């Protein structure tokens, strides 16, 4: 048995499914999940000392690569002053100032400890601000595991083949309307009928939890116009896209300004952090200024603020996001060329430093239906062939991939050589 197999067997005795987040269990690809013991730069190393080029990046945060020395040093410095105070710090104010300066829509921001907490709080705030109960989300989009959002959710719920989670009361779900992603007509029709009941529309500006589906031309702009027309709060869930698609997030990249935004992953530099913010008039409704309650023992944790601040400052250098997108584009071009040469139906998508891989004969991937029509079984085989070649992809056909700024020529060569062998093997199957 490998060390990972031994550890997984033991983990299952004490941890449900042997993991602390479902997608890590490899149910989407089969086999035993890898247990990692070290990560550095563009690589992760498992418990059997096998080294892999990493395109998961801890599900997005590691845009600088793993164990960046400046981030580690910032955390070490803060460690000497304590782990947590449960009180305001200069670091959290500095973080708030930086986030508001980088993101076009942010007048004020509140720090929390996860992306789920950020989206949950933003929706509560939108409901409190508007006095309305119902919300709109989109099929295949995932906004964390709070009850009102696990309604036809993507990500892990999609991989497990369930449209919503047991344990979510019908009374919660009835206030969540789920519409097709990239279908502006469905939004227009729904708001024409029940717009007065809708507190907010929450959307991933790039749907990163049904792999990676960019917005159709005019979709985000149309959402903005519809929200303005019906007095609905527009929330961009930028937990995944924030500071990755562009320094100012997807909203800066696509030129559409939401009322509220949620962030996670990169904003914590690898530590457990989320935040939400937006227009001052809305944010001033939250406690202690207003009646909408939100709180958190570890919100603004100084260790996390140190890691996040350092990360955001480093990715702000000129040319950073252009270089990240260029590498990602070269990676996808190389994969597409090798799939085509092997006669394998294959489509890629890209939004800056995030990407999607689909075994599909479609010309493009635009909708949830397009995603579901892709060949998940072929992806499973591809995943393990790439793993054998020293490349770690997301262990699910429905999760986006991520590059970092330290992925370079060596990593590109390793990846494309492994892919060429993998596509050739698939072509013979």
Curated annotation (Swiss-Prot):
Transmembrane segments: none annotated. One of its GO terms (cellular component) is cytoplasm. GO terms for molecular function: glutamate-1-semialdehyde 2,1-aminomutase activity; pyridoxal phosphate binding; transaminase activity. The modification N6-(pyridoxal phosphate)lysine is found at residue 265. It catalyses: (S)-4-amino-5-oxopentanoate = 5-aminolevulinate. Its main location: cytoplasm. Its cofactor is pyridoxal 5'-phosphate. Keywords: Cytoplasm, Isomerase, Porphyrin biosynthesis, Pyridoxal phosphate. SUPFAM superfamilies: PLP-dependent transferases. One of its GO terms (biological process) is protoporphyrinogen IX biosynthetic process. It is found in: Cytoplasm. It is an enzyme of class 5 (isomerase). Its EC number is 5.4.3.8. The keyword Isomerase applies. NCBIfam families: hemL (TIGR00713), PRK00062.1 (NF000818). Homodimer. Belongs to the class-III pyridoxal-phosphate-dependent aminotransferase family. HemL subfamily. This is Glutamate-1-semialdehyde 2,1-aminomutase. It comes from Azotobacter vinelandii (strain DJ / ATCC BAA-1303). The lineage of its organism: Bacteria, Pseudomonadati, Pseudomonadota, Gammaproteobacteria, Pseudomonadales.
């Amino acid at each position: 048995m490998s060390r990972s197999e031994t550890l997984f067997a033991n983990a299952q005795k004490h941890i449900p499914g042997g993991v602390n987040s479902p997608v890590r269990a490899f149910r989407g690809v089969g086999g035993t999940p890898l247990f990692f013991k070290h990560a550095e730069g563009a690589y992760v190393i498992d418990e059997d000392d096998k080294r892999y080029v990493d395109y998961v990046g801890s599900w997005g945060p590691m845009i600088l690569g793993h164990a960046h020395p400046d981030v580690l040093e910032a955390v070490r410095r803060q460690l000497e002053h304590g782990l947590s105070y449960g009180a305001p710090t200069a670091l959290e104010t500095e973080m708030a100032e930086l986030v508001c300066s980088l993101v076009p829509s942010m007048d004020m921001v509140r720090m929390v400890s996860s992306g789920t907490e950020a989206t949950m709080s933003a929706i509560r705030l939108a409901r409190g601000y508007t006095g309305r109960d119902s919300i709109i989300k989109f099929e295949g989009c995932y906004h964390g595991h709070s009850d009102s959002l696990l309604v036809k959710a993507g990500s892990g719920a999609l991989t497990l083949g369930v449209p919503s989670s047991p344990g979510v009361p019908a009374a919660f779900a009835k206030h969540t309307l789920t519409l097709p992603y990239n279908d502006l007509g469905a939004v227009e029709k729904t708001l024409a009928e029940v717009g007065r009941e809708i507190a907010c529309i929450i959307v991933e500006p790039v749907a990163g939890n049904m792999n990676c589906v960019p917005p159709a031309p005019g979709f985000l702009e149309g959402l903005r116009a519809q929200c303005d027309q019906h007095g609905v709060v527009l929330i961009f869930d930028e937990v995944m896209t924030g500071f990755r698609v562009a320094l100012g997030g997807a909203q800066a990249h696509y030129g559409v300004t939401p009322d509220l935004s949620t962030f996670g992953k990169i904003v914590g530099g690898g530590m457990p952090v989320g935040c939400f913010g937006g227009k001052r008039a809305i944010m001033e409704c939250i406690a202690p200024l207003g009646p909408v309650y939100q709180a958190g023992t570890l919100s603004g944790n100084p260790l996390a603020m140190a890691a996040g601040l350092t990360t955001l400052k480093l990715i702000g250098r000129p040319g950073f996001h252009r270089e990240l997108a260029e590498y990602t584009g070269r990676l996808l071009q190389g994969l597409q060329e090798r799939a085509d040469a092997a006669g394998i139906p294959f489509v890629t998508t890209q939004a800056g430093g995030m990407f999607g891989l689909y075994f599909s004969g479609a010309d493009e991937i635009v909708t949830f239906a397009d995603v579901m029509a892709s060949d998940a079984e072929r992806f499973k085989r591809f995943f393990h062939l790439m793993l054998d070649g020293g490349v770690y992809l997301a262990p699910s056909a429905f999760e986006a991939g991520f590059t970092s700024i330290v992925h370079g020529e060596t990593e590109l060569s390793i990846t494309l050589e492994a892919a060429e062998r993998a596509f050739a093997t698939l072509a013979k199957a």
